[in-house]
């Protein structure tokens, strides 16, 4: 079962990746798993949450904008982005937001 990320006290940043997939599935699951594994090793990474139906939403949490920029520039992540553009995504949008408050149980 997916879990909710255990994030620190705000402020921190959320990268919200919303997508609609193509029908091409070759290599997608392995790459998605690798990206979560690799992101978790990056400085400033705080956690990730993901859900998919017709529209997929993945939210990764980061300590600062510099960490997000470094992750975007990571060589393996750039390869995943290239394959996503070419094969896996029909549409996508990435949004970056500053989390100023959070609460929950």
Give the residues covered by each predicted segment.
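C-terminal structural segments of small proteins and small subunits
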Residues: 80-87
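Catalytic palm subdomain of template-directed nucleic-acid polymerases
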Residues: 61
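Short S/T/G/P-rich N-terminal loop/turn motif that feeds into the first structured element of a domain
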Residues: 1-56, 65-73, 89-105
């Amino acid at each position: 079962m997916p879990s909710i990320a255990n994030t620190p006290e705000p402020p921190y940043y959320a990268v919200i990746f919303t997508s609609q997939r193509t029908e091409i599935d070759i290599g997608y699951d392995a790459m998605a798993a690798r990206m979560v594994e690799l992101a978790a090793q990056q400085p400033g990474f705080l956690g990730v949450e993901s859900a998919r139906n017709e529209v997929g939403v993945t939210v990764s949490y980061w300590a600062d904008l510099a960490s997000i920029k470094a992750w975007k520039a990571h060589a393996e992540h750039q390869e995943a982005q290239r394959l996503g553009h070419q094969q896996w995504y029909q549409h996508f949008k990435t949004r970056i937001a500053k989390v100023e408050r959070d609460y929950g149980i």
